[in-house]
Amino acid sequence: MVDLKRIRQNPEEIRQAIRLKGVDLDLDALLALDREVQGLKARLQEIQTQRNRIAKEVPKAPPEAREALIAQGKALAEEARKLEEELREKEAHLQELLLKVPLPPWPGAPVGPDDRANVEIKRVGAPPEFPFPPLDHVRLLEKNGWGEPRVSQVSGSRSYALRGDLALYELALIRFAMDFMAKKGFIPLTLPSYAREAAFIGTGHFPAAKDQVWPIAGTDLYLTGTAEVVLNALHAGEILKKEELPKRYAGYAPAFRSEAGSFGKDVRGLMRVHQFHKVEQYVLTEASLEASDQAFQELLQNAEEILRLLELPYRLIEVSTGDMGPGKWRQVDLEVFVPSEGRYRETHSCSALLDWQARRANLRYRDQEGRVRYAYTLNNTALATPRILVMLLENHQLPDGRVRVPEALIPYMGKEVLEPCV
């Protein structure tokens, strides 16, 4: 959410952000509604002043004037009741519009309507050159007996189950990522995979991406697609001390997404599934661009180091204004090479949101001067599986169809090669 004062004082800045990010929002309608709300509040204040005056005059008024004053007071009370009802409706509508207001992006963001305007800024590692015909990850699963095809009969499409060494490998990856983040000074948390609507509004997933989220029938809860939803709500309503910042968390939770709108995309294998496992980096900083940028670089470097330890070729993408989402100040994606597709696919998304989420979730701290301010938030994936398994299987496959284990994972697996499950 953007500060309403900023919107009033800099409407052209916000209008530009709406254009750059392709947000469907009529700013003039929002500002007109804001003026109506302010007018209603002013009139209610006038009425309250008049009622206070009448309340003081009634006891002193002569009998012939008292009845008229009482009638006037009742008329004002009735007017106030109607205006308060109108005010509640208009404030609710204004709040709905404010939730759609995008954060102006940082000046270095590529300008464009979608991912075609994204810019590659760095490439690390070379794609593998195989002296044998390489297999895609689906064939590797079939050849080694690492998948359980019957699960689709039980759980439907876009579900998966792993067997043997690959099941242990997935668990090893999660523990590896949590250990890595703990060594970096982040507090590890295991989190629930569900939250109330307010938490989704706080991150910005609601109302825009509500179709991507599954509600839990008969409750006020929804399944989360990332631990960010719960992490961002942990300090909602609190006023932290400046000395407590930054808060640095590594949250693990199973994640769920409906994949609405992805019909026909990645229908085979592990690339796009309904349930997956994700370790999320999350940082809460003071309201300072310097502090935010420092945390952004830290989150980015953590993700890069993880990919290097996994011995995967990757690149960094500076995300364009039209692709980054309404709440982002800056976004850099990390993409890993997929040999069977001959292209890079996203595995991480590093985002700085300044106070956009903090205002929605009411995340505050008290600065050194004693002022209460909204904090800044940032997040990035540490590791998400099974998508990362696609890259690991395909990039590290051996001529006989087995898969090499990166050196950093050998202590977790107790072996150097993933063996078939027969």
Where are these regions (language model features)?
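TRNA-recognition modules of translation machinery and tRNA-sensing kinases, especially anticodon-binding
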Residues: 121-422
